[in-house]
Amino acid sequence: MISLRSIAFMVLPLLFSPAPPAQIRFTYENPKLEPHRYVLVVGEDGSGNFHSEGGAGSADGQSMSSGSMDRPIHVSKTVRESMFATARKNKFFAKACDDGGKNIAFQGTKTLEYQGPDGQGTCIYNWSKNSQIGKLTDQFEAIAATLDEGSKLQRQYEHGRLSLDSEMEILDQMVHEGRAIEIENIAPLLQTLAGDEAVLQRVQRRARTLLEASPSD
């Protein structure tokens, strides 16, 4: 028979095991765009995941998106602290956050979900006049844009290197305008481009510049 002491030793670690980190999940859906649906999950510890569902894209890498993507991501301390501060200031999204009305054009259905030991909540919206929700939406969309650009650059590197120059210029502009963030998530590809003498020097230089500017935490 198992003694009470043995049972206690088995149960105690379960009672005192650390709670999983809080998470924010952002879902975007728009049938007119590629990818037509994606989900970003960010943990308060910086871990995360990106999953997208879209069309096949063209073989030369010119179309907007490749097929579905599912990959881990990392979110820097500065960005994730901003994200979780917004969640806590807005009741963990357990509130109405859509202010679209009939006069606001459809911009995609967005869902924010918070799950953590301190609370939980969900809100669905097309557009929100809440500036904090707006900034959070921009952050998630900018991370997704970085991953999408990385996917396009990968396809172009494999199938159509002549278009790398113009695509890197687009990414560089997006980064400077804040429309693409968390560049470290495509760092392996940028390192490949920076070190490949077979691609244009402008591509190499831009890749190095983006790597130098990306956060390291």
What are these language model-derived features?
Residues 8-15:
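Bacterial N-terminal signal peptides
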Residues 77-101:
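Charged, amphipathic alpha-helical segments
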Residues 30-56:
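N-terminal targeting signals for Sec/Tat export/insertion, comprising classic cleavable signal peptides
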Residues 1-8:
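Bacterial N-terminal signal peptides that target proteins for export
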Residues 19-32, 96-217:
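Short, well-ordered, aromatic-rich surface patches in folded extracellular/luminal domains
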Residues 50-71, 170-172, 188-189:
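Acidic/histidine-rich, surface-exposed loop or edge segments in extracytoplasmic proteins
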Residues 35, 65-70, 91-98:
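N-terminal post-signal-peptidase region of extra-cytosolic proteins
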Residues 74-82, 114-120:
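A short, structured loop/turn motif at beta-sheet edges
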